[in-house]
């Protein structure tokens, strides 16, 4: 998890997502053969994946790890770049260069935030423009729970 976060902080979206996919449990159980080798639940983050001799590729310690929460943080806060601190949202993605972008629908109390990120520069990171309901703003969006709908466009 720490490598994913570090690669994101360094602006290496291609590597961050490569590591993210490597740790995704389902990637180790896509076929019957790989599932038989993995031997643990394909829906739970494994604390260990053995790498020696006849145990290579076998997962372990699936329900004893806090890794799933860090996996969530790595994906949402560092790759997709959605961070909320003190009821203020910022969006600083670090995604692969070949991604066109992505969208997020975030609900805060009764308000809806429709977020669309466009990777127009084909870079891994560096948010260049944030538009809230048609108006260019700084990348600090105060959250309110008034029931309004907010449309946010982010360009990297």
Predicted stretch roles:
Residues 2-156:
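Non-catalytic C-terminal accessory modules of carbohydrate-active enzymes
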